[in-house]
């Protein structure tokens, strides 16, 4: 089962903070980290 946070799109938003987040990559079938 894929965690809910992995289903979110990779949106860094307007914040200038440097916080790691995750999104689901259907090509690799894994959660990918982005900042």
UniProtKB/Swiss-Prot annotation:
InterPro entries: Kunitz_BPTI, Kunitz_BPTI_sf. Pfam families: Kunitz_BPTI. Coiled coil: none annotated. One of its GO terms (molecular function) is serine-type endopeptidase inhibitor activity. Contains three disulfide bonds. Residues 6-35 form the BPTI/Kunitz inhibitor domain. It is found in: Secreted. GO terms for cellular component: extracellular region. It comes from the Eukaryota. Keywords: Disulfide bond, Protease inhibitor, Secreted, Serine protease inhibitor, Toxin. Expressed by the venom gland. Serine protease inhibitor. Belongs to the venom Kunitz-type family. This is Kunitz-type serine protease inhibitor G1. It comes from Micrurus pyrrhocryptus.
């Amino acid at each position: 089962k894929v965690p809910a946070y992995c289903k979110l799109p990779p949106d860094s938003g307007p914040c200038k903070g440097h916080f790691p987040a995750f999104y689901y990559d259907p090509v690799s079938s894994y959660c990918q980290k982005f900042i």
